[in-house]
Design a protein with these regions (language model features):
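Bacterial extracytoplasmic/cell-wall-associated proteins, especially those involved in peptidoglycan
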Residues: 22-157
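Gram-positive cell-envelope targeting signals
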Residues: 1-16
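Alpha-helical and His/Cys-centered functional microenvironments
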Residues: 19
Length: 157
């Protein structure tokens, strides 16, 4: 019987560096601004991103990612449209009787979910649909042109 003795492993030499943490945590928007695909995000405040995330989750948290993106696009398209009062995210979101979660105050009961926040930030930089302006769960709005149904929502243009 032949036996073989393995050589002793070489000692591992680790080089260590001191990690310097920033004084204040960076916001998600600050981190995303460093990536080229998030060009344009600097046009939105942290509060606008938070509120858009909250409305998206409250209105479409149980829908597909695509359905959630369409809700974000609905709000952004209203900002760009002359058909709606308001020319920024907050004025569109808080307009009277436009979003149930704002009208009832439920927007403040939902946490700000990271997965939806990522999606909101991506949509702020590159929209999925630039035509949708309205949605509801039971049927199409009578004042807009029916377009398609995604999940539980009927979207109009």
């Amino acid at each position: 019987l032949v036996t073989y003795e393995a050589p002793a492993p070489e000692p591992v030499h680790m080089q260590t560096e001191e990690v310097v943490m920033p004084e204040a945590p960076l916001s998600a928007a600050d981190l995303y601004l460093e990536a080229p695909r998030f060009v344009g995000l600097e046009n939105y405040s942290e509060y606008e991103i938070e509120m858009l995330t909250r409305v998206t989750y409250a209105e479409a948290g149980n829908q597909s990612e695509y359905g959630q993106r369409l809700v974000v696009d609905t709000i952004l398209n209203r900002v760009d449209s002359e058909r709606f009062a308001g020319d920024d995210i907050l004025s569109i979101i808080t307009a009277k009787n436009q979003f149930d979660c704002v009208t009832t105050g439920a927007i403040y009961c939902y946490p700000e979910w990271d997965s939806v926040r990522w999606l909101v930030i991506e949509e702020l930089c590159d929209r999925t649909n630039s035509d949708v302006i309205a949605f509801r769960t039971s049927r199409y709005h009578s004042w807009a042109t029916p377009a398609f149904k995604e999940g539980d929502h009927y979207f109009s243009i």
